[in-house]
Amino acid sequence: MANILIDGYNLMAKMDGLGGNLEANRERFLLKLSQYRTQKNHNIIVVFDGEKGGWITESHEHTMGINIVFSKLGEKADDIIKRMVKEHDVEYTVITSDKEVASYAESSGHTAIPSEEFIFKLYYNSNPEADTNYRDEDPNYRTFSVKKKGNPKKLSKAARKRKQRLDSL
């Protein structure tokens, strides 16, 4: 069972079909995550921004089996995610496309997965007939920007860890 820590609005922004009312979109998003959690039995924590219109204090909810955290007024979800990966002994899989948060999580010993890759897992689990070999078909999936020593086909240690964690989701 994995502990998944999600940057809520970051992941919602990458998903298709979530235009319009913010609260209705958030409910549909949480319903999709709940279906995923039911299938995979992972512990999921979603952190939402309250920076511009939140409460005076940080609030926590438990809905549909998902732990939801709303940051307090003036605080970003990024700050809560950084605090959680720093303070907790649990190994998190952090889902975000925010490079700063991802690099902070990885430097703290956690795994960071881009939102786009997790979205594929989220939809694939609800549609098992989807093609599982998308990485083999995508010619740009494995790109290397620096010349490496050793086996040129072997992914970096961080990339192998990220791939292993993504495959386990």
Each model region followed by its residue ranges:
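Nuclease catalytic cores that cleave nucleic-acid phosphodiester bonds
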Residues: 2-5, 10-169
